[in-house]
Every structure is written in structure tokens, then in C-alpha cells.
């Protein structure tokens, strides 16, 4: 049963010969275009392909191409950015379409014969000591995987498809799952897809995975990495095989690892292709609200034009800050969710009493006299004072007051946008209906 299931999955995700030939042809053509532009520029630049296509760990139909323009180390960073973008843009002009995108430094994203191509300037590094920009390691990652994969390419494909199926794939900040490189490392380390699943509990308890023995080779640097990641409470620490300063699993959240933890156990107990290819989780968020008897507060806003890596963590911080303030104001917040341009807050009630009763100090103390002077309605309960104060009752009024005063923890780039947010109760724009359902039904991280 287990072997048959894996065979069936592999047949649908492994690229056929015709697809492989087409991918190779496209990459060869892109290399030719890039080299023509480089020759015309007179620069010494090497064209290198990185990522799953270069490593042959890609899934059928997943054809995003990463083409790196590797500059000599002698080039200053500023020149790398300016000249790199100039050459990348010249290549982009020879494709069907292109646009300039921004990460640590600008790069070009284009389309060539239906294939998405990222053209990224970087340094032509040989080891971790030469790394100057975040993207430089990608060359080393590709070289390490090619050297160590030893025919386990299909095992990596199975793990990637499994992680996609359980919604735990992708290390982007809005997902915080397993990266493709992390999946490759785990298969190389443990030997197969099934063995990685069997180690789900072991990895969590061992905590540290060190494929290249950096803790022995570079103990001071590697231990610094381990201590930093433990302090940040990461689920697992996978010391990058090509750089002891980095945890490959740094972006992996406890929630996404939890999905892997339970779904691995489920698959080993009851193998099924459905974990690889699940049915869409669709439903009506309004029905969920009626069933639960709770309320959904939605804030929608226009975020600044910055990349998700900057925006999403700041929206997360703001959502948590607003939830804390609502709790302090007497509203019970049952959960939060967020995206680039929205925040969801599930609350138990949207109305609270319109008065606040506050217990005060002993009436015959200095603090008691201050309490008496400060409040309008004051009475005695035994030796202590108490006061009554009018307050806003409706959650929208309370939230608007919190936003207006700015007394909440927020990301600096998004605070102004969120202060002017639209606040909606028990209804969301059509574009957010599915997100609202997944959030309210707990399907997003549901394991039972």
C-alpha cells in the first residue's frame, strides 16, 4: 500500500523526458541571451543557474528559473547593484516581458516563452567567508546539493509535494514553512522521504541538525548561531551546510512544523495520496460565525509599496498589538490572522458595558485622596474606594479610539496606513472570504 501510494504520487510529479528537454532548451537559450549581453557590456560575469531546476529537484509544471549573474569579488557592492541591474534589465528587454523587483538589491523578473525568470546579480563566491549579499549563498547551496544528493532527487520531490499538500511548503514570511533547500537537506541527511517523516519527532527533540559538522569545524561561530536561534525559540535549527552563521530553518514557524509533525504521523499510519493532493478547503465564513456565535472584526487598509518580507512581519506585530489593547479594554480576543492589507480579529463579543468600575486604594491614604480628586463618581467599599466611569461600548468605537491615540504596538512602515483602516464587523470583502473561512474554521492549521 505504501509503495503503491508513493509510486502513484511520483508518476504525477516527476517531469517526463519531453518536459526535461524543454526546460533544458529554455535554460540554454536564456544562457545564450545573457552571455550575448554580458559580452557587449565588457564585464567579467559568469551566468549560473540556481534553485530546483538547476538541482533537478523540481516538480512537474514548476518551472520558475533562477538565473544569477555572478560578478567578481573585486567589484564594490554599489557597482554590483547598479551595473547588475543595468545588465539584468538589458537581458529583460530581450524577453517577452520584464519588471524590476526589489529585495536586498534590485533584480529583474521576466517571462520567456511562458517561463518566469528571475535575473539576479550576485557575487561569484567560493565559500561562506566570501558571502557579501544574501543571494550569494544560492550558488553555494546549488553546488552542495548537486554534490551530495546522490540520486535522491525523487525522494526530494516526494517531500516537496507532501509539504505543499499539507500547506507547510514555502519559507516566505507570509507562509513560514519549509524551503525547498531545507527539504533537500533533510532528504540528504536522513536518506529518503519516508525517513524524514519518521524523524519528525526526533528532529524536534534533537533540535540541532548539522549536516557538515560545523559545531566541530567552526565551534565558536556555529554555537553563536545555535544560541541565537534557541533564544528566538525556533522549532529546529539546521545549520546551513555552506555557512555556519545561518539556520536554514530560521523562517519555519511552530505552526507549520506542527502540520508536518501530525501529517507525517498520519501518512505513516494511513498512507494516502490525499495528503499530497488535498481537496480545496472551501466554506462560508458567515455560517461558521453563526455556528460559533462569535464575531469577526476586519481591518482593511492600503499598505505602503514595500516587499512582503518587510510588510508582513509589521502587520503581524500590529495585529498582536491591537489584540492586546482590546483585551485590556475588556474584549476577549479568540484569534488573529493577517495579510499584506488586512487584519482579522475574532472576538467573543462586540459590545461591552458602557461603564467601567475601578477598585481604588484605602480611603485614608495619600493615594486614596488622589483617587478621590481624580474621579467624578466615587464610593466607599469597606476601607477602600471605588469609582465608576463612562466608557465606549461598541468595539468599533473602542478600536477607533485606540487607533486615533496610537497607543498600540505597531510596525513603523504600516502604522499610518492601519490608523486609517476601514473597520468592518461580521463581513469581509469578497476577495477575503476564503481567508476568513480558513481562519474562523481553524482549517489553516487544523490537524484533527
From Swiss-Prot:
Classification via InterPro entries: CAA_C (IPR048833), CCA-adding_arc (IPR008229), CCA_tRNA_nucleotrans_2 (IPR042090), NT_2-5OAS_ClassI-CCAase (IPR006116), NT_sf (IPR043519), NuclTrfase_I-like_C (IPR011068), Polymerase_NTP_transf_dom (IPR002934), tRNA_NucTransf2 (IPR015329)
Pfam families in the record: CAA_C, NTP_transf_2, tRNA_NucTransf2
Binding site for CTP: 52, 55, 141, 160, 169
Keyword hit for Phosphoprotein: no
GO molecular function, one term: ATP binding
Keywords annotated in UniProt: ATP-binding, Magnesium, Metal-binding, Nucleotide-binding, Nucleotidyltransferase, RNA repair, RNA-binding, Transferase, tRNA processing
Cofactors demanded by this protein: Mg(2+)
GO BP term, example: RNA repair
Catalytic activity field: a tRNA precursor + 2 CTP + ATP = a tRNA with a 3' CCA end + 3 diphosphate; a tRNA with a 3' CCA end + 2 CTP + ATP = a tRNA with a 3' CCACCA end + 3 diphosphate
EC number: 2.7.7.72
Binding site residues for ATP: 52, 55, 141, 160, 169
Highest rank taxon of the organism: Archaea
Binding locations of Mg(2+): 64, 66, 118
Reported function: Catalyzes the addition and repair of the essential 3'-terminal CCA sequence in tRNAs without using a nucleic acid template. Adds these three nucleotides in the order of C, C, and A to the tRNA nucleotide-73, using CTP and ATP as substrates and producing inorganic pyrophosphate. tRNA 3'-terminal CCA addition is required both for tRNA processing and repair. Also involved in tRNA surveillance by mediating tandem CCA addition to generate a CCACCA at the 3' terminus of unstable tRNAs. While stable tRNAs receive only 3'-terminal CCA, unstable tRNAs are marked with CCACCA and rapidly degraded.
Family to which this protein belongs: Belongs to the tRNA nucleotidyltransferase/poly(A) polymerase family. Archaeal CCA-adding enzyme subfamily.
Other comments on record: A single active site specifically recognizes both ATP and CTP and is responsible for their addition.
Quaternary organization: Homodimer.
HAMAP family in alphabetical order: CCA_arch
Name recorded for this polypeptide: CCA-adding enzyme
Taxonomy of the source species: Archaea, Methanobacteriati, Methanobacteriota, Thermococci, Thermococcales
Amino acid at each position: 500500500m505504501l509503495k503503491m501510494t508513493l509510486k502513484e504520487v511520483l508518476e504525477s510529479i516527476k517531469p517526463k523526458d519531453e518536459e526535461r528537454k524543454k526546460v533544458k532548451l529554455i535554460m540554454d537559450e536564456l544562457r545564450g541571451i545573457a552571455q550575448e549581453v554580458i559580452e557587449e557590456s565588457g564585464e567579467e560575469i559568469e551566468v549560473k543557474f540556481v534553485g530546483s531546476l538547476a538541482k533537478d529537484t523540481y516538480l512537474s509544471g514548476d518551472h520558475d528559473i533562477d538565473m544569477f549573474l555572478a560578478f567578481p569579488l573585486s567589484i564594490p557592492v554599489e557597482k554590483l547593484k547598479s551595473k547588475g541591474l543595468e545588465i539584468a534589465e538589458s537581458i529583460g528587454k530581450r524577453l517577452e516581458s520584464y519588471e524590476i523587483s526589489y529585495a536586498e538589491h534590485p533584480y529583474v523578473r521576466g517571462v520567456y516563452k511562458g517561463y518566469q525568470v528571475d535575473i539576479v546579480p550576485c557575487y561569484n563566491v567560493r565559500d561562506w567567508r566570501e558571502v557579501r549579499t544574501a543571494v550569494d549563498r544560492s550558488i553555494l547551496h546549488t553546488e552542495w546539493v548537486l554534490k551530495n544528493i546522490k540520486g535522491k532527487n525523487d525522494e526530494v520531490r516526494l517531500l516537496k509535494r507532501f509539504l505543499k499538500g499539507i500547506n507547510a511548503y514555502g519559507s516566505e514570511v507570509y507562509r513560514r514553512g519549509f524551503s525547498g533547500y531545507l527539504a533537500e537537506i533533510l532528504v540528504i541527511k536522513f536518506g529518503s522521504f519516508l525517513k524524514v517523516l519518521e524523524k519528525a519527532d526526533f528532529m524536534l527533540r534533537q533540535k540541532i541538525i548539522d549536516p557538515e559538522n560545523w559545531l566541530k569545524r567552526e565551534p565558536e561561530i556555529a554555537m553563536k548561531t545555535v544560541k541565537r536561534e534557541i533564544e528566538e525559540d525556533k522549532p529546529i535549527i539546521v545549520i546551513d551546510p555552506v555557512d555556519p552563521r545561518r539556520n536554514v530553518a530560521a523562517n519555519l514557524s511552530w505552526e507549520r512544523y506542527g502540520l508536518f509533525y501530525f501529517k507525517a504521523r498520519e501518512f505513516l499510519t494511513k498512507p494516502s495520496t490525499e495528503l499530497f493532493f488535498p481537496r480545496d478547503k472551501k466554506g462560508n465564513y458567515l455560517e461558521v460565525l453563526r455556528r460559533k456565535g462569535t464575531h469577526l472584526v476586519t481591518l482593511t487598509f492600503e499598505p505602503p509599496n514595500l516587499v512582503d518580507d518587510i510588510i508582513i512581519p509589521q502587520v503581524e506585530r500590529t495585529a498582536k498589538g491591537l489584540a492586546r489593547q482590546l483585551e485590556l479594554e475588556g474584549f476577549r480576543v479568540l484569534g488573529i490572522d493577517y495579510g499584506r492589507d488586512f487584519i482579522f480579529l475574532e472576538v467573543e463579543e462586540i459590545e461591552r458595558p458602557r461603564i467601567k468600575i475601578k477598585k481604588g486604594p484605602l480611603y485614608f491614604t495619600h493615594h486614596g485622596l488622589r483617587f478621590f480628586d481624580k474621579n467624578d463618581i466615587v464610593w466607599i467599599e469597606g476601607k477602600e474606594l471605588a469609582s465608576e466611569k463612562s466608557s465606549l461600548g461598541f468595539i468599533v468605537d473602542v478600536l477607533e479610539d485606540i487607533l486615533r491615540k496610537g497607543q498600540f504596538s505597531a510596525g513603523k512602515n504600516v502604522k499610518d496606513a492601519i490608523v486609517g483602516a476601514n473597520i468592518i464587523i461580521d463581513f469581509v470583502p469578497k476577495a477575503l472570504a476564503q481567508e476568513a473561512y480558513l481562519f474562523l474554521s481553524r482549517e489553516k492549521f487544523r490537524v484533527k
